[in-house]
Amino acid sequence: MLKPLTNQGFTNKVFYDDETNRFIKIKSYDGFNHKSDAFLLNNLDFCPKIFVDNKKELQTEWINGITLNESLLTDDILKTIGKNLITLHNSKLKFYKENQIARRFNIYRKKISSLNRKIPILDKYYKKINLFLRNIDNSAPVHNDLWLFNMIKVNDKIYFTDWEYATMGDVHFDLAYFIESSNLNEKQEKVFLDAYGDDFEPKYLFIHKILVNALIVLWINAHEVLPFDDSLYLNRVEKYMEQLEKEKE
């Protein structure tokens, strides 16, 4: 019997099937999601096993564990997440290839314009953000949606879930997305990045922190009813851009 989950996402409908002990996602499409072959994820031991993936639905094994939040982020968990990510980025899995981030910026901007909304801080840095977007790499398999609520702890293992936005992309975006969406402090960020290794460029990571926060702001404002407040992410865009300008002086 299908039982609707309490925490439904913003796009799909999700259920628990108590007869098969499976997670069921009834797909809804937004133009960006469900692009990659989900069966590729069976190559990763930190992903729930995929049983069914078609245009209508996704069925995976049910992971019975603890959904992560900021209060649970021990050093060991941060290290595990870092190791999971370098494994993904070096996996050579062939996800759908596109500059999804640039396209999301473009579509969200058009939607916001149609809603007659203005975001002065993002307008102020419009040209610089566009330059950053043009230089995004798309040679590595990436998750693209690394919120803590998409991670489940089972004993010493951390499962990554909700892969619907996975594409080929830039490793720096994944790293920045996790750091920014999880609100890591400097110590936590260092623990995480040390576990990931040295296969990234700090200057590009910083630029992608700007892009991540700007993208979250755009996503929020592309909704007719704002799903949550955008001030934290707007303030970060301003702070990081000012810091970038000072470093160039």
Curated annotation (Swiss-Prot):
What is the species of this protein?
Metamycoplasma hominis (strain ATCC 23114 / DSM 25592 / NBRC 14850 / NCTC 10111 / PG21)
Classification via SUPFAM superfamilies: Protein kinase-like (PK-like) (SSF56112)
Give the matching Gene3D superfamilies: 3.90.1200.10
Q: What is this protein called?
A: Protein LicA homolog
InterPro entries in the cross-refs: Kinase-like_dom_sf
Protein family (similarity comment): Belongs to the peptidase S49 family.
